[in-house]
Amino acid sequence: MTRRAATVTRTTTETAISLSLTVDGKGEVSVTTGHGFTDHMLTLLGFWAGFDLTLTCNGDTHVDAHHTVEDAGLCLGQAFAQALGDRKGIARVGNARVPMDEALTEVDLDISGRPYLVYRGDELLPPVIAGDEADLWREFFKSFANGARINLHISLLYGKNGHHLLESAFKGLGLALRRAAACEREALLSTKGSLD
């Protein structure tokens, strides 16, 4: 199998990001964004996906974490899409239900080339998690789905602790990505012959 890997760099007035990704890795992850909770969530995602991931971001966290989180999601998504290449042979669809103590999240996705996000249950999240607005994480998932060109459904089913809910979501996303990216056939899984 061809090595499925990509490197992405992106520099704006808000963030400077350097990222390398190997889809079929060993779960070796190093994330440094200047925002500890983001590092924690992206490390979980990479580990549960089985990615080898190195991501560094120098962002305007003196404002807040918004640009850092959003741009990290976009770059990670772009790297994932690039690494998969023509997507021939992948399972394409993946899902996972992951508990974290009292919290449970379901993640379903399709590597369809048609980016879309459905993010349900975020009313369960407290207004602030790790010092930032809870809706920041919707922006991460939206940016990731757009960059990766995937249809992504995340349902926070129940739970009381915002950290636990998000942790179950990131673990679930990693596991669903691992399943969807798995090589299972030779041909493209599409009756129309294209994933665009």
From Swiss-Prot:
This is Imidazoleglycerol-phosphate dehydratase. It is found in: Cytoplasm. Pathway: Amino-acid biosynthesis; L-histidine biosynthesis; L-histidine from 5-phospho-alpha-D-ribose 1-diphosphate: step 6/9. GO terms for cellular component: cytoplasm. The keyword Amino-acid biosynthesis applies. The keyword Lyase applies. Belongs to the imidazoleglycerol-phosphate dehydratase family. It catalyses: D-erythro-1-(imidazol-4-yl)glycerol 3-phosphate = 3-(imidazol-4-yl)-2-oxopropyl phosphate + H2O. Keywords: Amino-acid biosynthesis, Cytoplasm, Histidine biosynthesis, Lyase. One of its GO terms (biological process) is L-histidine biosynthetic process. Gene3D superfamilies: Imidazole glycerol phosphate dehydratase, domain 1 (3.30.230.40). It comes from the Bacteria. Pfam families: IGPD. Its EC number is 4.2.1.19. GO terms for molecular function: imidazoleglycerol-phosphate dehydratase activity.
